[in-house]
A protein has these predicted regions:
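Bacterial N-terminal signal peptides that target proteins for export
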Residues: 1-7
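Lipid interaction determinants
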Residues: 20-106, 111-113, 118-179
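C-terminal motif of bacterial Sec signal peptides marking the signal peptidase cleavage site
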Residues: 15-18
Length: 179
């Protein structure tokens, strides 16, 4: 082996040996494993929570690629005890004979630390339909991303139990539990 190759291998071995190991904290995950952090979700957050007027029935089927044909606008989060989540967003607007529909579906894992949830997408899909301009229609993979939420259980003015959910540095939005 050439001296240059030996030097390169030595530098690579040094850098690899010096890589920090995971400290077990899901908020500092190891790189390159292909998996995303996942912790159990506290019972107070487990369930399907919605904001707005959105149908949660067959919102999106990842197996068939079919979207629901429901109307309304809103979003939902579904947090499972095993540390997984689903998110859906829908906007349905009709004006001057044109109907525009936009939908987003994401699923993945969640890491929880107190009232902070970090959502790690493993799958995302977006769809848009415009009945007045078919060239604007699409159904494609969404951007895989990470989302941080701050969650606070609470009660609205009518006594309904729900979650106040916000992104850092934003105001809370009220989400009711789907029962």
């Amino acid at each position: 082996m050439s001296a240059k190759m030996m030097f390169s291998l030595g530098v690579a071995a040094f850098l690899f040996a010096g890589c920090p190991k995971s400290d077990g904290n899901p908020f500092t995950p190891e790189e390159g494993a292909g998996s995303t952090p996942q912790t159990p979700v506290p019972a107070a957050f487990v369930g399907t929570w919605y904001n707005g007027s959105i149908s949660l029935t067959n919102f999106y089927n990842p197996t068939t690629g079919e979207w629901s044909n429901a109307v309304g606008s809103g979003s939902f989060y579904r947090f499972n005890q095993n540390g997984t989540f689903e998110f859906g967003w829908q906007m349905h607007v009709s004006l001057y004979g044109c109907t525009n529909i936009g939908m987003v579906y994401r699923r993945g894992t969640v890491a929880v630390q107190d009232s902070v949830l970090v959502l790690y997408d493993q799958y995302a899909r977006v769809m848009a339909q415009d009945n007045c301009s078919a060239s604007r229609n699409y159904d494609r993979p969404g951007t895989i991303s990470t989302e941080t939420l701050v969650i606070q259980p609470g009660q609205d003015e009518w006594g309904n139990t729900g979650l106040y959910i916000r992104a850092p540095n934003t105001d809370y939005s009220w989400f009711l539990q789907n029962r």
